Structures are given as structure tokens and as C-alpha cells.
Amino acid sequence: MHRRNLLRAAAGIGVVAAAGCLGEDGPTALDTPDDQQADPADLAYPAYGQELPEATLPSPIHDREVNTREFVGERHTLFTFLFTRCHEVCPALTANLAQVQTDATEDGYSDEVALMPITFDPVYDTEEVLREFAEARGADPGAENWQFLRPENDERAEEVVGETFGLPFQKTDAYTPDEGDSHEMEFDHQSLTLLTNVDGYVERAYAGGAPQPDVVLDDLTAVRNHFE
């Protein structure tokens, strides 16, 4: 069942009840986003105050399977969704996570955060391609706190990214599976970066473009301080 349908099926719980569990005694460290115009339950993707969805995907650079909730109870986690031939928002989305990784290394909190970019173009985005793409954006993809997740095939990508995380994407007529960079957009897609806390709840869902790096770092710092 799609995430949106699951949320609607649980509508009896009510948005008001959900909001009532937030705040100082709730599952989040941050307050409701100032720019939040829609109720989280009306959004297809996980939003403020909601639990992180669960899916298990290969992490080819580390040669193991990783569950999206693997670090719940241990680390705050950042997710984003991309394809490496993207010439628009995807490089910035990845660079944001790389900047967090660098800041964590420099300030000594690498073991408090996990970075999980997820590709939805598994045919083209092989282990080597993912590694080179991450390194070009300033990341250390071999580090333990960087898990570049790659679905096994297109169907699994749709299941996890499109359905479990509620982020739509679609191949364009320019798509080729293995002919390199066509310098055109192979996918139409929305952008999303999720900041989830150590307890597995969404603190921020940055949608509609790449968030400013300083905003992400400031939000992460506030979350870290809250859970110290």
C-alpha cells in the first residue's frame, strides 16, 4: 500500500492528536517549521513529527545490506534521493550531506550522525559511479557514517523511493540505461532531504529544492544539543 493511503487509513488518530504529542515533551527537538503550510498527514512523504519509514537496501560501497532505521537509537540521520546524471538539484543535495560529514569529522561527532543518500537509478548508478559521484561532491563514501543505498532494480527503487518514502520520480524520453551522461534530464523528480533524530522521528523535511547548507547544519546542531 502506498504511504499516502496508509496515512489516510490512520486518519482516525487525527492530526490534532499527532500535534498534541509534539513540542517539549514530544518526539522532536525542533519546533514546527515556520513554512509548514500542510498537515504532515496530507503529504505523501514523511514530514515533521512522523516516524522514519523502514526499508532494507544494498549499500554497495560497504558491501552489505542497510536498513533505513538501522541507526535509530544510535545516531541522527540525513537522507536524500537522487540520480547521479542529474544536472540540477542532485549534486547540491549530495554536497549538503558531504558538508555535514565534513563538519562532523572536524568537530568530532562523526559517530553521532549517519548520511544515507538513495539512488533511484540503480541500473546506471553502479558502485563505482556512486563512489565517484560522492567523492566529487566532497564526501568520503568509504566512511562508516556514509551509506550510499542502491535498490536492486528499477522495481525496488519505485517500491522504496516512490511508495515507502512517497517521493515521485519518472524516467524521461532522454533516459538511457548505460550510455553515459546524455547531458539531458533522464528523470523528472521532486527533491527531498530528511533530517531524522536518534529516536527515528522526522525533524525536518526539506522539500522543493536543496536547503541551504547552514540551515541543515544549524538544525542538526539544535537536534544534537537537545538529545545530549
Model-flagged regions — what are they?
Residues 1-228:
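Hydrophobic alpha-helical segments
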